């Protein structure tokens, strides 16, 4: 188990590229006891949620396409994009050089437990997905 403060700190560290490379702003931090944690980033067209349910050991990264600066209906699969689906689309288009460069970006990050490794893996996947985001056909 990870406590809320440690989760938020880890996500902010691993996903710092969202602010630096994509000019997204940290929009929300939620720590609901020891059960649910969420860190969200936002720009004018999308919001990204990195959430974790401690009891279920469930990590989830979702990109929401905004409409009039509001989140779309969660069930709208064209506007609520789960990282695992995007990752499978991107891996078929990204070349080895892009993947290697992306992995190099994250070399300095330390991970000492399973959850932090999964958070880091999600950060790597999201960064690569965002590099190809406008090329993806999401329907």
Which functions belong to the PLM regions below?
Residues 1-14, 26-139:
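Intrinsically disordered, low-complexity regulatory regions enriched in serine/threonine/proline
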